[in-house]
């Protein structure tokens, strides 16, 4: 109030506000805001139907999803973390008319790419979403997928992994199946930190340790399919190659004494 009126006249700040909003002083109301009085313009904005606003709401919501790397596909300018094949949008048993990523919404979605009995799944109502997808080998709820993963990991005994790795693995699968693999015990001669880093960061595996807290030659992986033997063999083969590389670089480092590396510090700027 005091910054808006001076000696009974509108200040430059208030005049600027009126001009910017195409208002006159007579259109303002004097209101009490806590311990002070303020001038305000009171107006009624005409309401709109929610269905007429949903297109914009969804577009804005999608843009706010934190995605580090986006990609384009097809001939349109839409961007997302992966190509979008279909858009399903239901409110109750009604389809919400939308067009996102160049796709018009409908009541159809897809189950698991390899395990589902049919390629296309129709939903009668939105309430059926989680239940129907489960019958087509997709656990739609993130928290439930993670519970399945943790239960599977715990069934094999002690394992190493933080919440960040659990979250990442949970986001990578639709139908989680926990399996156990192993590598040659000779690789245990590598520093445990090297083994754990290779398994967790590069392969998204969960290393295992024994009752004494020592790292073992076994590890746990979370697969998106149920073909156990082939999945385990493939993952063991990939890990073997990575551990061979790690062994080579570690042995190469051991060939140079620490004191011989001291002269290299002259090239380091602190």
Residue ranges with predicted function:
Residues 18, 269-270:
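Hydrophobic alpha-helix position signal
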Residues 161-269:
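Catalytic nucleotidyl-transfer cores of nucleotide-processing enzymes
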Residues 1-187, 195:
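Long, basic N-terminal domains or extensions that often function
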């Amino acid at each position: 109030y005091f910054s808006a009126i001076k000696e009974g006249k509108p200040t430059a700040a208030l005049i600027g506000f009126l001009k910017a909003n195409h208002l006159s002083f007579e259109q303002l109301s004097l209101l009490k805001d806590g311990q002070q009085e303020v001038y305000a313009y009171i107006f009624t904005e005409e309401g709109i139907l929610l269905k007429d606003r949903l297109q914009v709401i969804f577009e804005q919501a999608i843009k706010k999803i934190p995605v580090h790397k986006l990609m384009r596909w097809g001939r349109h300018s839409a961007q997302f973390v992966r190509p979008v094949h279909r858009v399903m949008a239901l409110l109750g048993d009604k389809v919400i008319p939308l067009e996102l990523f160049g796709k018009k919404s409908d009541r159809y979605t897809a189950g698991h790419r390899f395990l589902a009995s049919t390629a296309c799944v129709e939903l009668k109502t939105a309430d059926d979403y989680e239940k129907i997808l489960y019958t087509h080998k997709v656990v739609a709820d993130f928290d439930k997928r993670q519970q399945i993963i943790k239960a599977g990991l715990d069934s094999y005994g002690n394992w190493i992994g933080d919440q960040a790795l659990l979250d990442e693995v949970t986001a990578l699968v639709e139908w989680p199946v926990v399996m156990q693999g192993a590598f040659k015990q000779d690789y245990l001669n590598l520093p445990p930190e090297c083994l754990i880093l290779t398994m967790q960061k590069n392969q998204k595996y969960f290393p295992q340790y024994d009752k004494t807290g020592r790292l073992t030659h076994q590890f746990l992986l979370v697969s998106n399919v149920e073909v156990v033997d082939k999945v385990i063999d493939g993952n063991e083969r990939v890990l073997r190659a990575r551990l061979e590389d790690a062994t080579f670089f570690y042995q190469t480092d051991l060939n140079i004494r620490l004191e011989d590396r001291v002269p290299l510090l002259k090239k380091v700027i602190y």
